[in-house]
């Protein structure tokens, strides 16, 4: 058994898939990456985020488990991505795991916050109960668990 006081590693995966919605976000923001996911089980996943539930349809969208591999390749190109590692205490890691597990167990309750994502373009944050967009979900988990102190732009 390992030492339970050792730091644990979580992973933040940023991607830009080339879907029409990703291209729209990229055009509006000029950000290199347009999607965020969080993983707790190593650099190859699984990762959790708010995204489309089916690869060929933009809707419905909600809380999904993402596997890297096929998702990081399309028929046209490889998907640009960036993987960050963050060391956290065992308590924060456990808190993140509990939060993600609880939400994923009730994933039908959660919906994609399309209005919230669109309102970001106008710097007007829109929080809706049980609605998230990808970076809102990841940032909320990091903030609520105490993993990072995040300020709003």
Predicted segments with their positions:
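Cysteine-nucleophile amide-bond enzymes
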Residues: 1-153
């Amino acid at each position: 058994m390992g030492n339970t006081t050792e730091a644990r590693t979580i992973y933040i995966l940023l991607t830009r898939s080339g879907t029409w919605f990703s291209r729209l976000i990229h055009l509006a923001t000029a950000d290199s990456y347009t999607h965020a996911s969080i993983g707790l089980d190593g650099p190859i996943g699984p990762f959790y985020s708010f995204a489309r539930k089916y690869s060929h349809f933009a809707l419905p969208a909600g809380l999904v488990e993402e596997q890297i591999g096929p998702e990081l390749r399309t028929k046209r190109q490889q998907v640009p991505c960036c993987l960050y590692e963050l060391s956290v205490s065992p308590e924060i890691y456990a808190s993140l795991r509990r939060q993600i597990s609880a939400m994923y167990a009730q994933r039908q309750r959660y919906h994609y916050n399309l209005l919230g994502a669109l309102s970001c373009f106008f710097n007007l944050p829109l929080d809706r109960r049980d609605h998230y967009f990808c970076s809102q979900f990841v940032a909320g988990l990091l903030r609520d668990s105490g993993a990072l102190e995040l300020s709003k732009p």
